């Protein structure tokens, strides 16, 4: 055993007051619904005097920590403490692929005040303090997800051993819900791995893989899964060992000067990223520093207080609403029918989108994929997409080369339709050309199986027109991905009037296997995401034509909470691609979607954005990849999270001369934001009224995951409820007077304002709202 892989007994400053003792039966399994007769925590003592505490919440696929489990843990520890010959404890999970996925955040629903939530955190701190102060070594044997409260429990143990397995990840993701770790995580983690690494983990919510966890000192050993328990038992038998020293860099940063510099830099970078919209990030910094500066008692007290206050914040409520919305959506099939089994998938087109779709199908769904492209180079490009993605995992030691080869063997390609007779669903990702897509439908009906579904990745063409000449129109559907496919979580599933229920259910099932969140939307121009994005983009362009500088427009919307400004978005998407959908929207939905004349002038000047190095901003190295149009891309599709990392680019000032505009900031950020976002909100309500989306929940998910609507606002409909329909109607009518009829509030919004209605039930907890009437 390496001297660096050690066990340490932690001194804790948290109160160790015992909690009440329930009657428990330690000889039976656990149950989330009946914790008295079926405890989630059981203790078995081996002949060698090592106690094994098993966590198994019966009835749940994964373990989550619930408030009622506190009494069970206290009882287990008291029973173990009473064993005079006990040499150590090992905590393991009874689930096959999960340690503890986190705390059950529905507990927050029972908290009506910040004080209630603070008490909840203090209870968690007290229980974990008992583990930390236990008189014999306690070792966590971790396999599978060890997140949130699960990692906080592991941190309270004296040693952590984890399995070398892709399913094993460790992290503190509470910040993603507008919270901070409330059971000691902000205090124990910095002392274990160093303040710099701890802040990075807690502020980002990132998940750490086993080898990385070992390197940073988060775990003491990484072993194959089949010997995990044996190694943990031996570690417990080894007794108390000295704690491994922190690396010199972390020791330097823990000193007065290093610490002051580190926190100053971290706070500056955090505010630059969050723009002040995510108070949890700032509270995390404060709480971690307080614990380091003033010691454990002050740190734990600050952690509990901050947890309580954040739990009651509107930002956390909005983020938790999104969490529960996506969780409920994942349980739905999108149809009353049963999905057909999917064994093989076909992809038409080997471009950016086709390659991405093949990638997630093979690597996430684990399904064989057959790619068809007219050019062998297209097939090679698609194969390279997945090879490169898997190669990154191999280089970071998150995957073995043999596994890379195995997953690559799931993807094959051809310039003809050989192999498509065995395919269950085909995803088409070719040019946005109606006649071409109709020909693809005919080809699949000829060369595919009788049951093969044809799913088009179109971003603008009506699915009914794509299916117009089909012999089996009930098996034609839209499946709209967003780029980059392996990063963007949303897909729109678009049935037309003849699409069968089985086709809908099967398509949703495929999307879910690919790791996607799927919303079912109606077959009308722009579907949902691009339809609400179009007026937002148009209005930003009008602000530019009014003389507002490009950077002022973009900064206003980024400050509001979007990941990237609308002008930068146009450059990233491709100005030609972004404007292509506008005529279709105007034709089907009316003149309010008419693009400002500036787009025609810009396109005639040869400006397409980043891809050809000419757009609203200057680019020294334009990207060499092909036009997004070729791959079925759309304005929302290029809304990659990587934009957050882009450095500020200089504006191409020549565009002002081209447009005949003299730039001068005069509107103000509030005016710009209101003009752009009010149109988006109004259009979202129209989509709900026209049944483009099934309910407000789907509309919120689509906007946040599809175009980056500020998550801390919860989505357009949560945001509308927070503003009040009457205030929104009032604002829109004022904008009508100032800028024209395009701001006319839709009738549903007017009616809701008159009747003082909301989109979500007023008295319902966000945890309880899984669906709402449209």
Curated annotation (Swiss-Prot):
Ranges for region Enoyl-CoA hydratase: 1-224
Protein's UniProt keywords contain Hydrolase: no
Location in or out of the cell: Cytoplasm
One GO process term, biological-process aspect: fatty acid beta-oxidation
EC number(s) reported in the record: 4.2.1.17, 5.1.2.3, 1.1.1.35
InterPro entries: 3-OHacyl-CoA_DH_CS (IPR006180), 3-OHacyl-CoA_DH_NAD-bd (IPR006176), 3HC_DH_C (IPR006108), 6-PGluconate_DH-like_C_sf (IPR008927), ClpP/crotonase-like_dom_sf (IPR029045), Enoyl-CoA_hydra/iso (IPR001753), FA_oxidation_alpha_subunit (IPR050136), FadJ (IPR012802)
Entry annotated with the keyword Mitochondrion: no
Pathway: Lipid metabolism; fatty acid beta-oxidation
Renumbered residue ranges of the record's region 3-hydroxyacyl-CoA dehydrogenase: 340-774
Reaction catalysed by this enzyme: a (3S)-3-hydroxyacyl-CoA = a (2E)-enoyl-CoA + H2O; a 4-saturated-(3S)-3-hydroxyacyl-CoA = a (3E)-enoyl-CoA + H2O; a (3S)-3-hydroxyacyl-CoA + NAD(+) = a 3-oxoacyl-CoA + NADH + H(+); (3S)-3-hydroxybutanoyl-CoA = (3R)-3-hydroxybutanoyl-CoA
Assembly and interaction partners: Heterotetramer of two alpha chains (FadJ) and two beta chains (FadI).
HAMAP family: FadJ
Protein's recorded name: Fatty acid oxidation complex subunit alpha
């Amino acid at each position: 055993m390496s001297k660096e892989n050690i066990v340490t007994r932690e001194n804790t400053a948290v109160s160790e007051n015992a909690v009440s003792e329930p009657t428990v039966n330690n000889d039976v399994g656990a149950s989330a619904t009946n914790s008295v007769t079926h405890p989630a925590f059981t203790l078995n003592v081996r002949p060698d005097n090592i106690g094994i505490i098993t966590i198994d919440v019966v009835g749940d696929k994964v373990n989550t920590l619930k408030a009622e489990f506190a009494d069970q843990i206290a009882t287990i520890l008291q029973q173990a403490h009473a064993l005079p010959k006990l040499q150590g404890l090992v905590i393991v999970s009874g689930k096959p692929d999960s340690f503890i996925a986190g705390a059950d955040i529905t507990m927050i629903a029972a908290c009506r005040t910040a004080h209630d939530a603070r008490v909840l955190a203090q209870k968690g701190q007290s229980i974990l303090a008992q583990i930390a102060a236990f008189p014999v070594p306690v070792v966590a044997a971790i396999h599978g997800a060890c997140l949130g409260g699960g990692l906080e429990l592991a941190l309270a143990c004296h040693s952590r051993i984890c399995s070398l397995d892709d399913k094993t990840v460790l992290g503190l993701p509470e910040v993603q819900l507008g919270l901070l770790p409330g059971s000691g995580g902000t205090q124990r983690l910095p002392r274990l791995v160093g303040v710099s690494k701890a802040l990075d983990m807690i502020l980002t919510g990132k998940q750490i893989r086993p080898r990385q966890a070992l390197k940073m000192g988060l775990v003491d050993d990484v072993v194959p899964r089949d010997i995990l328990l044996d190694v943990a038992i031996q570690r417990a038998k080894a007794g108390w060992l000295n704690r491994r020293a922190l690396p010199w860099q972390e020791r330097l940063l823990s000193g007065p000067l290093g610490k002051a510099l580190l926190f100053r830099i971290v706070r500056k970078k955090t505010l630059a990223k969050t723009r002040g919209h995510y108070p949890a990030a700032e509270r995390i910094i404060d709480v971690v520093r307080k614990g380091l500066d003033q010691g454990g008692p002050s740190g734990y007290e600050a952690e509990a207080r901050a947890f309580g206050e954040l739990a009651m914040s509107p930002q956390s409520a909005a983020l938790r609403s999104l969490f529960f919305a996506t969780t409920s959506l994942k349980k739905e099939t999108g149809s009353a029918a049963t999905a057909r089994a999917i064994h093989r998938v076909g992809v038409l087109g080997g471009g950016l989108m086709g390659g991405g779709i093949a990638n997630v199908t093979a690597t996430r769904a684990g399904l064989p994929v057959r790619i068809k492209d007219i050019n062998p180079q297209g097939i090679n490009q698609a194969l390279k997409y997945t090879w490169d993605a898997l190669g990154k995992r191999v280089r970071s030691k998150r995957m073995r080369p043999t596994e890379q080869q195995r997953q690559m063997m799931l993807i094959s390609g051809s310039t003809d339709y050989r192999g498509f007779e065995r395919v269950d669903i085909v995803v088409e990702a070719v040019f946005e050309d109606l006649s071409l897509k109709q020909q693809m439908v005919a080809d699949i009906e000829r060369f595919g199986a009788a049951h093969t579904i044809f799913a088009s990745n179109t971003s603008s063409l009506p699915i009914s027109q794509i299916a117009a000449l089909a012999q089996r129109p009930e098996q034609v559907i839209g499946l709209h991905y967003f780029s980059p496919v392996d990063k963007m979580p949303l897909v729109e599933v678009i049935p037309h009037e003849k699409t069968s229920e089985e086709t809908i259910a099967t398509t949703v099932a495929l999307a879910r296997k690919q790791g996607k969140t799927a919303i079912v939307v109606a077959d009308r121009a722009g579907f949902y995401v691009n339809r609400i994005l179009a007026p937002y983009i148009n209005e930003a362009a009008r602000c530019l034509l009014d003389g507002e500088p490009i950077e002022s427009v973009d900064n206003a919307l980024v400050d509001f909470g979007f990941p990237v400004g609308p002008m930068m978005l146009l450059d990233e998407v491709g100005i030609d691609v972004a404007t292509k959908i506008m005529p279709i929207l105007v034709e089907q939905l009316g003149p309010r979607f008419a693009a400002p004349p500036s787009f025609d002038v810009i396109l005639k000047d040869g400006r397409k954005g980043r891809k050809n190095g000419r757009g609203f901003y200057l680019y020294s190295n334009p990207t060499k990849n092909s036009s997004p149009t070729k791959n079925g891309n759309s304005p929302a599709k290029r809304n990659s999270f990587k934009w957050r990392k882009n450095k500020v680019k200089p504006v191409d000032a020549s565009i002002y001369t081209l447009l005949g505009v003299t730039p001068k900031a005069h509107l103000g950020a509030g005016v710009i934001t209101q003009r752009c976002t009010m149109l988006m909100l109004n259009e979202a309500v129209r989509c709900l009224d026209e049944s483009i989306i099934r309910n407000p929940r789907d509309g919120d998910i689509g906007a946040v995951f599809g175009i980056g609507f500020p998550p801390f606002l919860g989505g357009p409909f949560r945001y509308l409820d927070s503003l009040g329909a009457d205030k929104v109607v009032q604002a829109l009518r004022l904008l009508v007077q100032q800028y024209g009829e395009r701001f006319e509030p839709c009738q549903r919004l007017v009616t809701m304002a008159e009747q003082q209605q909301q989109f979500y039930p007023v008295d319902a907890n966000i945890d309880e709202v899984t669906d709402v009437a449209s």
